[in-house]
From Swiss-Prot:
Active site per UniProt: Y59 (proton donor)
Lineage: superkingdom: Eukaryota
SUPFAM superfamilies: GroES-like, NAD(P)-binding Rossmann-fold domains
Protein name: Enoyl-[acyl-carrier-protein] reductase, mitochondrial
Length: 346
């Protein structure tokens, strides 16, 4: 009989309200990985919007039920099977967002794992494979930016937005950052300036001062990064230089993305879209993806990209964490999965 180990896992057996369908259960995991596999002790994983959409059944591709949740995180290899390219003690993350990760232990194919530099702090490592690569690809793939060039983005305080700010600073680009107005707006601006933002405006501020501001810097952005849609997409795409590019990676407003006829016809802007997870799995992009992962890790080790603010919770408190994620008024929730990776170590 095959030896197994018991593992606590967050599982949903039907799609629906995450507060109702997500349950903490005990599962049996093989104690010995097979050839080309690893037994991984998962340490930490965030709750991403993608996770909520999947549990609700709103994602483009529905997983086969039952499903262990999670789409991103960091783990430690406990045991590597024969022929594996990993070794015990390696820190790893997942290449595919379909790999179960809200569980203490799991057996994972080598092809679904990415080795991480063990020097990267665990909270950053847990959130390293979605937001920073998205920022990197958007900054590097679509426009040949040079030091001193300007980019503009909305949703600047999001995970992707913060990665964009830090990478622009590291690469020598200038960032114009648009955020929604809120009660603590001055504190938010100060935080974004702290991590490297060159300019920060609320949507209302930029609407009223964009002409004067662009005249003052005497240049227009070459690249606009759109994670919101609606009027916000119109706002940032309308100030691009002639022939500039607007890349859309999300639609937080849940409204159609708007672009003016003038920007498209007379300013000849290019509008693109990217889903980095899908892009990375296309064989023709493999070399570019590997370069992206290497560069992101170098920035992380050098301290040039940092972990976003997160609240650390254990799996047993998943309902509270999910509720906060659904409400959207709290900072991102990070599951500290294994008892050996207590909050004090992350």
């Amino acid at each position: 009989m095959q030896k197994t180990i018991r593992s606590q896992a967050l599982i949903y057996r039907k799609f629906g309200d995450p507060l109702k369908v997500l349950q903490l259960e005990t599962v049996e995991v093989p104690a010995e990985p097979g050839s080309g596999e690893c037994l991984v002790e998962w340490l930490a994983s965030p709750i991403n919007p993608l996770d909520i959409n999947r549990i609700q059944g709103n994602y483009a591709v529905r997983a086969e039920l039952p499903v262990i949740g999670g789409s991103e995180g960091v783990g430690r290899v406990v045991k590597a099977g024969s022929g594996s390219r990993f070794k015990s003690g390696d820190h790893v993350t997942i290449f595919s967002a379909n790999t179960p990760i809200w569980t203490e232990f799991g057996v994972v194919d080598d092809d679904e794992l990415v080795k991480l530099d063990n020097r990267i702090p665990l909270d950053l490592a847990a959130t390293l494979m979605i937001n920073p690569p998205t920022a990197w690809i958007m900054l590097k793939k679509y426009v040949n930016l040079q030091k001193g060039d300007y980019i503009i983005q909305n949703s600047a305080n999001s995970g992707v937005g913060r990665s964009v700010i830090e990478m622009c600073k590291a690469l020598g680009y200038k960032s114009i950052n648009i955020v929604r107005n809120r009660q603590n707006i001055e504190a938010l601006k100060t935080d974004l300036w702290r991590i490297g933002a060159d300019h920060v405006f609320t949507e209302e501020e930029f609407k009223g001062t964009s002409r004067q501001f662009l005249k003052s810097i005497n240049v227009r952005p070459k690249l606009a990064l759109n994670g919101v849609g609606g009027k916000s997409a119109l706002q940032i795409s309308s100030v691009l230089e002639r022939g500039g590019t607007c890349v859309t990676y999300g639609g937080m407003s849940k409204k159609a993305h708007e672009f003016t006829t003038s920007a498209l016809v007379f300013n000849d802007i290019c509008v693109r879209g990217v889903a980095v997870g899908m892009w990375a799995r296309q064989e023709e992009h493999l070399d570019e993806w590997n370069l992206c992962v290497d560069e992101v890790q170098k920035l992380a080790v050098a301290g040039k990209i940092t972990a976003i603010p997160m609240e650390k919770v254990v799996l047993a408190d998943h309902k509270t964490a999910i509720q906060k994620s659904l409400e959207g008024r709290s900072i991102k929730q990070l599951f500290v999965i294994n008892s050996k990776a207590s909050a004090s170590h992350i």
